[in-house]
């Protein structure tokens, strides 16, 4: 039986811009791609920032791109997910955050807010702390203590004073909250089982012992005088009327507002694990909330933002329908069309074949801009001829990997090589009465120079990417505008004539279908 395969061809790093300077995509001789654009419906997709779950204005990347494409929904990074909820007001209804505050009110106890005090956005964000403080204020809780871990890595090394002043001003405005302790992340956020460091942070939090200071600003100024930058500030207890401002006690509530797990695990274990043996410590009965899941094995904690489920990704769903699929790429992008495309799952789905074509062994890809594109093309044509596959996902690495070298002529050659492959593969799919959707995961080689300096640019871009619908039946159809990467999977399923699963929040882009 001759199958009518539906293929997605991802031209990695192939973005669109009208700028001609440094635009390898525009300057390349690509008769096949240009012909497909003339003859078939096409549109542009947003592939950066909030449209792919990244912070506003942040360029896309291959991991995030393939995650969004393969899952058929916008996958929000934890930072963006929480910030979006705060902006939408949803955060203030979070069950676990509210539980922590309500328990403190019920028990007439204190709420302690632990976390990295900066806007670095890698482990935490000061705006998330502010949102919790606001909710505590709105619910009428007064005993709220901030235990500020100081950054100096994801932000400048001596910037903690600004963040301390910022949060103290905010708390003054709210009339809720006081800084109870400070500790450099070197101590409070160790991840290498150097328990002697964590113990110093623990002692400040629970026993109120360590360095002593009458104010947070005074403590940080003293550290700067001693040439100690933020990361290495010794755990310091802030005194009020000569006593620790607020130590952690039985029945207290804690919200650890770091969203990245790796450096939050150890201090969380010290405060919660029943059989903790990193150092001697008294065990407390706490209502402990972690912003995200730090580790499945940590005991006695509740999680404000549980791991996102990627149920019914494109690959999983197609497999559940009993259909066969192929994933094919060269080494550089193989993980992207398999692991990331499947929502971070390593194991192939039932009926999912994988073809890995080795990438060439060269120092940099400008030395061989064709990479292994021709080998990928030959292999996929053989696989199409087998009539086995209902769906094929293919990635050409060249526009991205050669784009990263910053060598314009090499990037131009890379595009021209890929264009030859696009032509041959499209012809073969059309011969089988199938469909090819051509797209990219993010931009890169369409901007090879920094417009402000004129120097080579090697990074990804925030530009839109193409989406071309190639099929014998497509010529009289139209594609909707304003699409995003998450719309690709629903569009492919529509073309395959199957229902879109409810977990996919992307939309079908084919007008009238």
From Swiss-Prot:
GO MF term (any one): phosphoglycerate mutase activity
EC number(s) on file: 5.4.2.12
GO cellular component: cytosol
Pathway annotation: Carbohydrate degradation; glycolysis; pyruvate from D-glyceraldehyde 3-phosphate: step 3/5
Cited Gene3D superfamilies: Alkaline Phosphatase, subunit A, BPG-independent phosphoglycerate mutase, domain B
Active-site residues, as the UniProt record annotates them: 62
UniProt binding sites for Mn(2+) 2: 12, 62, 441-442
Cofactor (UniProt): Mn(2+)
Pfam families: iPGM_N, Metalloenzyme
Domain of life: Bacteria
Family, per entry: Belongs to the BPG-independent phosphoglycerate mutase family.
Role summary: Catalyzes the interconversion of 2-phosphoglycerate and 3-phosphoglycerate.
The protein, known as: 2,3-bisphosphoglycerate-independent phosphoglycerate mutase
Organism field: Clostridium tetani (strain Massachusetts / E88)
Gene name, Swiss-Prot/TrEMBL: gpmI
């Amino acid at each position: 039986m001759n199958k009518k395969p539906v293929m997605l061809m991802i031209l990695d790093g192939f973005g669109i811009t009208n700028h001609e300077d440094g635009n390898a995509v525009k300057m390349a001789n690509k008769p096949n791609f240009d012909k497909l654009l003339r003859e078939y419906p096409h549109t542009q997709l947003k592939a950066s920032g909030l449209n792919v779950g990244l912070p506003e204005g942040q360029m896309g990347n291959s991991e995030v791109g393939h995650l969004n494409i393969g899952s058929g929904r916008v996958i929000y990074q934890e930072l963006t997910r929480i910030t979006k909820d705060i902006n939408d007001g949803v955060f203030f209804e979070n069950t676990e955050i509210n539980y922590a505050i309500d328990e403190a009110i019920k028990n007439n106890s204190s709420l302690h807010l632990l976390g990295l005090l900066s806007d670095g956005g890698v482990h935490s964000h000061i705006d998330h702390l502010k949102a919790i403080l606001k909710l505590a204020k709105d619910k009428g809780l007064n005993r709220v203590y901030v235990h500020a871990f100081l950054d100096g890595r994801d932000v400048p090394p001596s910037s903690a004073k600004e963040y301390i002043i910022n949060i103290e001003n905010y708390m003054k405005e709210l009339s809720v909250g006081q800084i109870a302790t400070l500790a450099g992340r070197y101590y409070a956020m160790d991840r290498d089982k150097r328990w002697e460091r964590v113990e110093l942070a623990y002692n400040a939090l629970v026993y109120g012992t360590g360095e002593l200071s009458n104010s947070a600003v005074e403590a940080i100024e003293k550290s700067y005088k001693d040439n100690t930058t933020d990361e290495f500030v010794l755990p310091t207890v802030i005194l009020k009327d000569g006593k620790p401002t607020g130590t952690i006690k039985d029945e207290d509530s804690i919200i650890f507002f770091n969203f990245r797990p790796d450096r939050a695990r150890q201090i969380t274990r010290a405060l919660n694990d029943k059989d903790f043996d990193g150092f001697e410590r008294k065990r407390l009965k706490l209502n402990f909330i972690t912003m995200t899941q730090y580790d499945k094995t940590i005991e006695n904690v509740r999680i404000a933002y549980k791991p996102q489920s990627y149920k019914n990704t494109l690959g999983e769903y197609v497999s559940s329908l009993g259909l066969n699929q192929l994933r094919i790429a060269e080494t550089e992008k193989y993980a992207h069309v398999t692991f990331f495309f499947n929502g971070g799952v390593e194991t192939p789905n039932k009926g999912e074949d994988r073809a890995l074509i080795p990438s060439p062994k060269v120092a940099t890809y400008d030395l061989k801009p064709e990479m292994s594109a021709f080998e990928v093309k030959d292999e996929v044509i053989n696989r199409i001829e087998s009539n086995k596959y209902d769906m094929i996902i293919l990635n050409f690495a060249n526009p991205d990997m050669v784009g990263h070298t910053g060598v314009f002529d090499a990037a131009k050659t890379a595009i021209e090589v890929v264009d030859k492959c696009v032509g041959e593969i499209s012809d073969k799919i059309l011969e089988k009465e199938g469909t090819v959707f051509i797209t990219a995961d993010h931009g890169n080689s369409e901007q090879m120079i920094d417009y402000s300096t004129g120097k080579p640019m090697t990074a990804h871009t925030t530009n839109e990417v193409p989406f071309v619908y190639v099929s014998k039946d497509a010529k009289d159809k139209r594609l909707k505008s304003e699409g995003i990467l998450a719309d690709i999977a629903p569009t492919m399923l529509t073309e395959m004539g199957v229902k879109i699963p409810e977990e996919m929040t992307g939309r079908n882009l084919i007008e009238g279908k």
